[in-house]
Swiss-Prot record:
This is F-box/WD repeat-containing protein 5. Pathway: Protein modification; protein ubiquitination. The gene is Fbxw5. It comes from Mus musculus. A motif (D-box) lies at residues 308-316. Pfam families: F-box-like, WD40.
Length: 573
């Protein structure tokens, strides 16, 4: 400005100069004078800075909740938990999983050292309790989850045994006394288990039917196993699902429809009644029907005709089927007459949906199964186990199946349970599975897919920044977590990653010394993130904004001012 206070440069010229500067230089220039300060806060200037700095596609609009481009730039720059503030070294082996309590006051960690540790989440994190599971013949702990009122902790682990053993167990721990309340068998161990209600949990069991055919049974268990009467259940069978081609059900979780932003159900039963299960195939442009619409109506005649065609073809030498392919074909045909179709139900936002990984072509989990849980199924009350078994419907049909054409290595729900985020390592385009025991090779890049559980559609392009290197038969789970604005995941490249959910951009890489297995946002404070690694550490990360607040010098308390009359009286001559 000149001496008279008038600007020497018009605002438009200052604006053009500021466009050529980076964000830090714009803010520094804004300290020179009032004119530059006003221009440095211009909305159009910060819109341009935002798209250029974060490399967001121009057709992506500003976040609906944002009030200005400047504040939105600041949110992504200053409020992402990317500053390491604490490293926890109490575990002595690889740390596999982290989970927060719903209040955010505590979190739990599982490790190859076979302990479940419970931590106090204060400004400085401290260890509250450590439960050693080796006396129960566990090899290691792998997963944990707090119940809704944070009074109980579900801990899942793997039994000691031969390398090919798939048995595990779920333990329920009281968070008041840290007493072990109950133990439930869980097979295969990577079902993990989950809470359905505050006092009931879901576990799995596996029954072999053939070499590559099996049946997964999902059980509802009471967390308190005291038996008051022989006529009262502590366990109840939820679903029985057929597995083909060496596949099994794994990674169960529950989505609560009542937490959706709108009252629409994930599955509108009034529209879907009578329709077969549908496969939403991400590898093609159309939806393909999973079953022939006439299968349920043709009954045993259809099954007999199908079996006769298969066997005649084999005997005549026309069908060159391997033993595995023949077993799968026969199992499919036999199941058609013994599978109960999905139950119809009036729209009810109290319903919950069981979500899990599965498959139909190979043992590699390449599909997401979704099964509606009706209100009457959410309790162990009902006929005592063994009663009411007269139906021919041996298996339960799924309500939805989503095929991702890749190996699923992680899943997580958004806080409102509407969006499902999936870590997947893709198969090569056009892959054909000829042998269920030899799935296609998987990509080193991990795709983070997003599905809207209201519409059963993929809603975002895949996020890709993190990597994994292990082959199919050694592939392990990479746990992810979702907060209000961010999604985070571990990776095998020794980093954790954070993306913005709206803009689909990677915001931070969080360094470890080995594979990052799990991440967890505080449910009450998304500017705090925990990461767990094979380097046997847990790291706590906070946003730059929170770090500044915590490190700011606290002013000394001033002497309490005396009232004017008291001050005046003491100074009278």
């Amino acid at each position: 400005m000149d001496e008279g206070g008038l600007p020497l440069l018009p605002d438009s010229l200052v604006y053009q100069i500021f466009l050529s500067l980076g964000p830090a230089d714009v803010l520094a220039a804004g300290l020179v004078c009032r004119q530059w300060q006003a221009v440095s806060r211009d909305e159009f200037l910060w819109k341009e800075q935002f798209y250029r700095y974060y490399q967001v596609a121009r057709d992506v609009p500003r976040h609906p909740a944002a009030t200005s481009w400047y504040e939105e730039f600041r949110r992504l720059y200053d409020m992402v938990p990317c500053v390491e503030v604490q490293t926890l070294k109490e575990h002595t082996d690889q740390v596999l999983h982290l989970s927060f309590s719903h209040s955010g006051y505590q979190f739990a960690s599982c490790s190859k050292d076979c302990t479940v540790k419970i931590w106090n989440n204060d400004l400085t994190i401290s260890l509250l309790h450590s439960a050693d599971m080796r006396p129960y013949n566990w090899s290691y702990t792998q997963f944990s989850q707090f119940n809704q009122d944070d009074s109980l902790l579900l801990a899942s682990g793997v039994f000691l045994g031969p390398h090919n053993s798939s048995s595990g167990e779920i333990a329920v721990i009281s968070l008041d006394s840290f007493a072990l309340l109950s133990r439930v068998r869980n097979k295969p161990y990577d079902v993990f288990g989950c809470w359905l209600t505050e006092t009931s949990l879901i576990s799995g069991n596996l029954h072999r039917i053939g070499d590559i055919t099996s049946c997964s049974v999902l059980w509802l268990n009471n967390a308190f196993q005291d038996v008051e009467s022989e006529n009262v259940n502590v366990v109840k069978r939820l679903f029985k699902i057929q597995n083909l081609n060496a596949s099994t059900i794994r990674t169960v979780m529950v989505a609560d429809c009542s937490r959706f932003d709108s009252p629409d159900l994930l599955l509108d039963a009034s529209d879907q009644a009578g329709l077969p299960c549908r496969v939403f195939d991400l590898g093609g442009d159309t939806e393909e029907e999973a079953t022939d619409p006439g299968l349920h109506t043709s009954g045993s005649d259809h099954v007999k005709k199908g079996l006769r065609r298969v066997f005649d073809s084999v005997l005549d030498g026309h069908g060159q089927l391997s033993d595995c392919a023949l077993e799968t074909k026969v199992a499919e045909l036999l199941a058609q007459g013994h599978t109960k179709p999905p139950e119809c139900n009036d729209a009810d936002t109290r319903n919950k949906y069981l979500i899990f990984t599965t498959g139909c072509l190979t043992y590699s989990p390449h599909q997401i199964g979704i099964k509606q849980i009706l209100p009457h199924q959410m309790t162990t009350a009902g006929p005592v186990l063994g009663e009411g078994r007269g139906s021919d419907a041996f298996f339960d049909a799924l309500d939805h199946v989503i095929d991702v054409h890749g190996h699923i290595i992680g899943m997580g729900l958004s806080p409102d349970n509407r969006y499902l985020y999936v870590n997947s390592r893709a198969w090569p385009p056009g892959s054909v599975v000829a042998d269920p025991m030899q799935p296609p090779p998987i990509a080193e890049e991990i795709d983070l897919l997003v599905f809207d559980l209201k519409t059963m559609r993929e809603v975002k392009r895949a996020l890709r920044a993190h990597r994994a290197y292990t082959p199919n038969d050694e592939c392990f789970f990479i746990f992810l977590d979702v907060s209000r604005d961010f999604v985070a995941s571990g990776a095998e490249d020794r980093h954790g990653y954070i993306w913005d959910r709206h803009y689909n951009i990677c915001l931070a890489k969080l360094r470890h010394e080995d594979v990052v297995n799990s991440v967890a946002f505080s449910p009450q404070e998304q500017e705090l993130l925990l990461t767990a690694s094979d380097d046997a550490t847990i790291k706590a990360w906070r946003s730059p904004r929170i770090v500044r607040v915590l490190q700011a010098p606290r002013p000394r308390p001033r002497p309490r001012p005396r009232p004017f009359f008291s001050w005046f009286a003491s100074h009278r001559r």
